[in-house]
Curated annotation (Swiss-Prot):
Protein name (database record): Glyceraldehyde-3-phosphate dehydrogenase 1
Keywords noted in UniProt: Cytoplasm, Glycolysis, NAD, Oxidoreductase
Lineage: Eukaryota, Metazoa, Ecdysozoa, Arthropoda, Hexapoda
Binding site for NAD(+): 11-12, 32, 77, 313
Keyword Cytoplasm: yes
PROSITE patterns (UniProt xref): GAPDH
Gene name tied to this protein: Gapdh1
Alphabetized Pfam families for the sequence: Gp_dh_C, Gp_dh_N
UniProt-annotated binding residues for D-glyceraldehyde 3-phosphate: 148-150, 179, 208-209, 231
Keyword Aminoacyl-tRNA synthetase set for record: no
Organism listed in the record: Drosophila melanogaster (Fruit fly)
Length: 332
């Protein structure tokens, strides 16, 4: 399997490394100009949300050593200066949140990377959601996007519903856990004034492009979905509320049956299904993109339904980054 590099050792960067270890993928290099190797060891070892790393991690001779495997550490601010080739890294995960366009992310190619996977939505890079549109990938693509955690939750569910019952139109709300871009106390936040309010004190209405992005990965739904977010004071796990008008009438039990069928078949490991009395903490470190909550959804009539699906917005997403890379490697 080709070797992986990670640019940006933040929440997603560190969890992509954990996911890579779980899935037997090889990470050979990490770049982060803001933390040295000893700090990397500390941040990787201890995680307030997902718990202590269960393997071994140490700093040795300037390397980050995880489970006995040496990982080269770079400290470059400009991606063009990262010598990925020297570490053998061919697939680079761009997880700084800064270099999210083809132009900016392509600078990794100068250092020897062959492919770049942006762990965020992109304005112009082709977007992929595992279980939904991987067949649109072609080996000539140098820079791709793994979309957002919310799009990864919504798209598999929307695909099942649209394939079986036809989505005429719909609105999505994600009740979303706090992320690093928010403020611990009230502060300035550019043009997005509400986003600057204290994360621990407030339910904050916010914009999200996640629903519209589904139209990019499922062209049949282009223009049929939009949505918004509420940021809430929890550290992790979010939940999508998808309210849709259907073209083909169906009982809620029929909808549940199709989702459960998909969760055991073509979308196994991507879309989960539960009929238990769950709450958000039950999904900490869950590796699915989306877990349909059969008991939480409701229908007004046979063509108007509200569907609920949970996601670990950090770890589920990080696992999909590795899955996308593995798929790309199988085709390149």
């Amino acid at each position: 399997m080709s070797k992986i590099g990670i640019n940006g050792f933040g929440r997603i960067g560190r969890l992509v490394l954990r996911a890579a270890i779980d899935k037997g993928a090889s990470v050979v290099a990490v770049n982060d100009p803001f933390i040295d190797v000893n700090y990397m060891v500390y941040l990787f070892k201890f995680d307030s949300t997902h718990g202590r790393f269960k393997g071994t991690v140490a700093a040795e001779g300037g390397f980050l050593v995880v489970n006995g495997q040496k990982i080269t550490v770079f400290s470059e601010r400009d991606p063009a200066n990262i010598n990925w080739a020297s570490a053998g890294a061919e697939y680079v995960v761009e997880s700084t949140g800064v270099f999210t366009t083809i132009d900016k992310a392509s600078t990794h190619l100068k250092g020897g990377a062959k492919k770049v996977i942006i762990s965020a939505p992109s304005a112009d890079a082709p977007m992929f959601v595992c279980g939904v549109n991987l067949d649109a990938y072609s080996p000539d693509m140098k820079v791709v996007s793994n979309a957002s955690c919310t799009t990864n939750c919504l798209a598999p569910l929307a695909k099942v519903i649209n394939d079986n019952f036809e989505i005429v139109e719909g609105l999505m709300t994600t009740v979303h856990a706090t992320t690093a871009t928010q403020k611990t106390v009230d502060g300035p936040s550019g043009k997005l004034w509400r986003d600057g309010r204290g994360a621990a004190q407030n339910i904050i209405p916010a914009a999200t492009g996640a629903a519209k992005a589904v139209g990019k990965v499922i062209p049949a739904l282009n223009g049929k979905l939009t949505g918004m977010a509420f940021r809430v004071p929890t550290p992790n796990v979010s939940v999508v509320d998808l309210t849709v008008r259907l073209g083909k009438g169906a009982t809620y039990d029929e909808i549940k049956a199709k989702v459960e069928e998909a969760s055991k078949g073509p979308l196994k490991g991507i879309l989960g299904y539960t009929d238990e009395e769950v709450v958000s903490t039950d999904f900490f470190s869950d590796t699915h993109s989306s877990v349909f909550d059969a008991k939480a959804g409701i229908s007004l009539n046979d063509k108007f339904v509200k569907l609920i699906s949970w996601y670990d917005n950090e770890f589920g997403y990080s696992n999909r980054v590795i899955d996308l890379i593995k798929y790309m490697q199988s085709k390149d």
